[in-house]
């Protein structure tokens, strides 16, 4: 456990039931793959530090949400305080891909007046033989919504690290440029504690935050 | 046990295990623990010990009130008014009085952000009832007369071990500050109220301020303060290892607590609006039902239970599993039981084979700091490890307990159709709370026994703060768990209301 981090970002992980949200997060935070896992109840919490540049660490608080419809009223409450999100679908499950834009609509309504930086994640890419969604169409959809697209596998640990760190880096850039600012009453980004290094001007505390979806 | 090596004195002494080192075996009885901790009790400021963050309302003072239910009825005619919510629960004795009243008071706040405290318009807040004021006065006057009052206080609660410890309380001006063993004293009785202001007016002010924050806010603030403090100091690494709040957060306890508070708050708002929409007989029947449900949340079991023996791992696991199955929800408490049993395993290891443990420790140290090992530092490291592990375990188990309550709330609200009544669920949950808290208190005793035997050579002023800290955090843990339990009340109220309104339709 390392205490010093520059910022804390809250990330939310959403997507249909059984696309592998919890498994992806567990692979990222615990470094292992759980063969069987119970469906998530409501929301679960994880955290990990990510080093985006030598000596610059970001603490990620990751909200794992239940994909099941019946918990939707609980999970909705978490959009508002997230700065970033991973929107997952299962590449072997066409339905979960078709639901992507519903998820985006859902978040749009509940994240007001803020914005979430999303990355689209095609999960279970180890099961390429059962693929029902091509990389091309997924990339197209992602581009239409201004998202990046990445394919991951929690089982084979493919791109898991990259999915989270790329998103973290993107958010960090936006924070550095002042497009995302720390705000009172919003928990998406929090300033952390910096070692005895120069803090530079990254610490922006303006009250305005621009759109970036 | 992979602690940083804290040897400050580079005395070159060969660390040979001498027979006197094997001091871990005999002192399993708390008697010796008491002996060794007693002398310094008055003068020692407890450096590493942090008082439980304050968000207590003046209600916490009414430890003397024995029939809160009756009292609440006398106070507020409407059983759903604030008064009742705050006074109705707290019966089960004088220990572990908690943030509950403020926690349940705050869940009523509409639209309150997690860390965004909005002024509340409720004018009843912070104004203690006449009964409270009188108990405050009682309390205040009781403090000056320490021996007489304190020793007769019932210490039969889970922390009953302290009944054997004589306590000393010094009165300094407007605060009653107790030193050294003070933490032990209030665990037995008033938990966090030991540092009670003699000035009721001051308390009143404080009550007003604190009513607006939830337990998780208070904890978060305390944690953040600690994070800030530790980054500013060199001692960070070791400090963090033993800081309950930081560890509690690391195990996601804070997040689960916040989530539970959110569900509780939403449910409470719903309950209120439902009650507002009803009238006449319908309303009266429902109120009666809700009153019944509330009674199951009074945790009376704490009172009449005697000091219990430590349960075996299987017993505890079985009991929790059994209680959990009575809830009929699709989630199991394995994470908690596993962590709990692992903690007990750890405790028992050094006790059973202290010499082996110690030799390993020394070997480890020899590798670590080559020649700079002296015998004292070996022991020092050893009991500090126990302390760190104890705090860590308490934080972990508390976090997992709260996680369980959070999951329970989510499933009660959004689970499958229920096969059990809300009352049955509350009873199981209430019992679970008792079991969890008792187990924590027993565990803390095991830890301190362990600590005492490992550090028997230490001066009391080194050992005492650590022992105090363990007991203090165990007490805090129990309070948090009870607070979390109380947050389930509105959730079960909703569940009850839903089952009532669904039945005729079906």
Swiss-Prot record, chain A:
GO terms for biological process: autophagy; protein transport; Rab protein signal transduction; regulation of autophagy; synapse organization; vesicle-mediated transport. The modification Cysteine methyl ester is found at residue 213. SUPFAM superfamilies: P-loop containing nucleoside triphosphate hydrolases (SSF52540). It is an enzyme of class 3 (hydrolase). It is found in: Cell membrane; Cytoplasmic vesicle membrane; Golgi apparatus; Cytoplasmic vesicle, Autophagosome membrane. A lipid is attached at residues 211, 213 (S-geranylgeranyl cysteine). NCBIfam families: small_GTP. Belongs to the small GTPase superfamily. Rab family. This is Ras-related protein Rab-39B. The gene is RAB39B.
